[in-house]
Design a protein with these regions (language model features):
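Hydrophobic alpha-helical segments within soluble ligand-binding/sensing domains
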Residues: 2-27, 75-76, 125, 140-158
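Hinge/cleft segment of the Venus flytrap/periplasmic-binding protein
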Residues: 37-38, 144-183
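Short beta-strand segments enriched in small/hydrophobic residues
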Residues: 25-37
Length: 183
């Protein structure tokens, strides 16, 4: 494996979300991937996020919202209903790579006190970050990750040299709209 440590990236996302103040409530947005909500490829990242919150802010309430990635109207309605019932919640996170799915809601319902953290530098996530709807993205430098993975693959195929470690973690980048132009 070549990439970021998913557990640590989740903990870093939680740190960024909570670094400014004492947090009482967090909206954790998850994707509906199957009817029983069992498919969860981002579980290690989410566990890192939740463990950090539990250790650092044990009084914090986590509100989990499920949205369907292919139903933007449903996602908007879910967020609208939640924030109508919980206007005090100012901290949002999504531990998969599709924070852009809530961008329409964030754009149409601005709140200067809201802090939103997402993961991965997909073009649509970067656009949301650039527009100020997302505060931080935790990501990795994909060209470096790709270079290391391809080099290891080539050395294995050509030279017969296996990687020294099973997991080869790369550094994590913290993106904000103020450093986005240089990324």
């Amino acid at each position: 494996y070549y990439g970021v440590d998913p557990y640590k990236s989740g903990a870093l996302g939680a740190f960024l979300l909570t670094t400014r103040c004492e947090v009482q409530d967090i909206a954790l947005i998850r994707l509906i991937r199957d009817r029983k909500h069992k498919a969860d490829p981002n579980a290690p990242r989410r566990h890192g996020f939740l463990d950090y919150i539990e250790e650092t802010f044990p009084q914090c309430r986590i509100h989990t919202l499920f949205i369907h990635p292919e139903q933007p109207d449903q996602a908007y309605a879910t967020l609208e209903r939640f924030f109508r019932e919980h206007p005090e919640v100012k901290h949002l996170a999504m531990t998969n790579s599709r924070i852009f799915l809530i961008d329409d809601y964030l754009r149409r319902n601005p709140d200067p006190e809201r802090i939103v953290v997402g993961f991965d530098d997909l073009d649509r996530n970067l656009a949301s970050l650039s527009n100020g709807h997302i505060e931080y993205l935790v990501t990795r430098h994909i060209p470096l990750q790709s270079f290391q993975a391809l080099t290891a693959f080539a050395e294995c195929v050509i030279k017969g040299t296996k990687p020294q470690r099973r997991n080869n973690y790369v550094h994590m980048d913290i993106l904000h709209r103020r450093n986005l132009d240089n990324y």
